[in-house]
Amino acid sequence: MDGEQEARVVALVCSSPPQGYARWSLRLLADQVVQLKIIQDISHETIRQVLEDNELKPWRKQEWCIPPQANAEFVYHMEDILDVYKRPADPKHPLVCFDESPEQLVRETRQAIPMQIGQLERYDYEYQREGVANLFMFFAPLQNWRTVKVTDRRTKTDWAHCMRDLVEIHFPDAETIAVVQDQLNTHSPACLYEVFPPTKAKQILDRLEFHSTPKHGSWLNMAEIEFSVLNRQCLNRCIPSQADLMRETETWASLRNHKQATVNWQFTNKDARIKLIRLYPSIDA
């Protein structure tokens, strides 16, 4: 196979598979290469070598948060968040990243068989759904602190109570709290006036400084990283009830706080203007 033929094979691999197929396989690629007369005859092993040489894995794909192109609104919110992340630690002005996530409650219908020497733990494929709970994550990276609140739902009332807890329980001595959160319709300061008396709502809001991630840019929220850790370390199993979920997440947060675990965020606006230049609108001189 010469260079031109290999380039055509690579282009074929990077295209959509033919109708009736969800993805490319080695043998399907070999058949298509012959049908398209790229080469007279080729084995699936040769195809495998071409894929390996070009670091192509058509059997794999990755879910990704794909941002818009040349979008000033996205850039504005991104640079605002990255500026907030550069602030030094200050107990009077803490940074708190806030996020939420649903959690399916699941009960096993049969007792799992424990792991033994030479044998993996085995569990039955049947399970019983026990409803859905909601998790609110509070994460202060500069204080190496986090906590998880479990609720029935994720309404604007629940969000308003979380903001009250942030001010009155978690950081009662802070003057202002910078809150990084996603752009959701329930994350509106106006919601506090629907839940609390005006005086109370104003007292809470006067101590909060909101910074929203761009739409389709939730990867900028460090609380999402903490949720990823929580899912891997704690939630990747059957948890049957909200009470069990509360106990497990409280224990996880307590142990992680004790270890002073945090996120070492390094990405800056300077990096963004180089690596994510496609997000920035072009300006004619």
Task: Indicate where each model-derived feature is located.
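Extended, low-complexity cationic-aromatic segments
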Residues: 77-164, 276-277
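Short, basic/hydrophobic alpha-helical segments
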Residues: 157-178
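Active-site proximal helix-loop segment of RNase H-like, two-metal nucleases, encompassing DDE(D)
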Residues: 146, 215, 223-242, 255-259
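C-terminal domain-tail junction helix/linker
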Residues: 109, 244-285
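Acidic/histidine-rich, metal-coordinating catalytic segments
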Residues: 174-188
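RNase H-like polynucleotidyl transferase catalytic core
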Residues: 122-127, 200-222, 237-241
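A short, amphipathic alpha-helix used for macromolecular contacts
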Residues: 1-42, 88-89
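Short, basic alpha-helical nucleic acid-contact segments in DNA-binding proteins
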Residues: 49-62
